[in-house]
Design a protein with these regions (language model features):
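Glycine-rich phosphate-binding/hydrolytic loop that grips phosphoryl groups
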Residues: 21, 109-111, 115-122, 246, ...
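Conserved phosphate-binding loops in N-terminal lobes of ATP-dependent enzymes
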Residues: 2-66
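Short glycine-rich anion-binding loops that position phosphate/pyrophosphate groups of nucleotides
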Residues: 14, 67-70, 138-140, 244-245
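Short glycine-aspartate micro-motif
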Residues: 6-10, 61-63, 131-136, 142, ...
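Adenine-nucleotide phosphate-binding core of ATP-dependent small-molecule kinases
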Residues: 31-58, 173, 182-239, 244-252, ...
Length: 295
């Protein structure tokens, strides 16, 4: 947890949140704003930094969680292939943040948003599992593999870069089977009508067999896809976060079935839904910076 107040930001494709965390690690103040990730450079930077400007104070360190592709040590992103943030590709964001918020460039730090989310969830459990995996389900599939709260991004025990979305299922990216778009598409094929994920989840909870089968298939697929990595990683705890985790009652049983299909020992793996909601990446970014810099 921070030894002194720290500023944090969580940047998404359509939103930005800035917050101040106190020495206890709890969110003391926060500001939220909409973000147009396709805006021209100057307007995008203004939108990006506006919430943080309201909280800025001299000498404050900032931890910023945002998606890649991004060179986090350098503070520069390419954002290749994501269709977002193209106007600030190649921009030195460390300098931009430093200048806008009146702090030293050395006090501006960047971390992957999925890693920040996972670290936040890792801190939420008093037991703090040694080998911890967090999978976030929403428009995509995010992931973090943590060893004592620090990210593991290479080696045979994790997917390339620690990114679960690079796992393939039948030659296709995992997100083609497990994401909000995948759920919507699968339901449309099976039921012949379009519904949003929350509507499909409500229908499944009410006993709609078509809606239920869509969730079962997706979660069994997810479990089977990540099981080899959870086994190699000697995972102690798995957390499922993101928007789809709100439908936990629909997810847990088929997820466990998929995990243990070929890896029987994973049937007893500790699994839980995320606890912190949208505060997870804020708390995680602060914790990561505090432990990596000693501040």
């Amino acid at each position: 947890m921070p030894h002194r107040p720290i500023g944090v930001m969580d940047v998404g494709g359509s939103h930005v949140t800035a917050a101040l965390l106190g020495p206890s690690g709890a969110v003391a103040e926060r500001r939220d704003a909409r973000l147009d990730s396709g805006a021209p450079r100057e307007r995008l930077l203004e939108q990006l930094l506006a919430p943080a400007r309201e909280l800025a104070r001299p000498g404050l360190s900032w931890a910023i969680a945002l998606p890649g592709p991004f060179d986090y040590p350098a503070g520069v992103g390419t954002f290749a292939g994501v269709g977002k943030f193209q106007s600030i590709a190649g921009v030195d964001l460390r300098f931009a943040v430093s200048a806008a918020l009146g702090t030293s460039a050395a006090d501006v730090h960047f971390v992957n948003d999925a890693i920040a989310y996972g670290i936040g969830e890792w801190t939420a459990d008093v037991e703090r599992a040694t080998r911890f995996v967090c999978i976030t389900l929403g428009t995509g599939v995010g992931s973090s593999f943590l060893d004592r709260g620090m990210p593991v991004e290479s080696g045979e025990e994790v997917p390339p870069h620690g990114w679960a979305f690079l796992i393939e299922v039948d030659g296709q990216p995992l997100e083609r089977s497990v994401s909000t778009a995948a759920i919507v598409a699968a339901y449309r094929r099976a039921a012949g009508q379009s519904r949003q994920v929350r509507e499909i989840a409500a229908a499944a909870s009410a006993g709609d067999p078509v809606a239920e089968s869509v969730f079962v298939r997706a979660m069994e697929t997810l479990g089977a896809a990540i099981a080899p990595y959870l086994s190699r990683f000697s995972t102690d705890e798995l957390v499922i976060g993101g928007g789809m985790a709100r439908s936990w009652s629909l997810l847990e049983v088929p997820l466990r079935a998929g995990l243990s299909r070929e890896y029987r020992h994973l049937a007893d793996l500790r699994i839980r839904p995320a606890l912190l909601g949208d505060e997870a990446p804020l708390i995680g970014a602060a914790d990561w910076v505090t432990r990596t810099t000693g501040n």
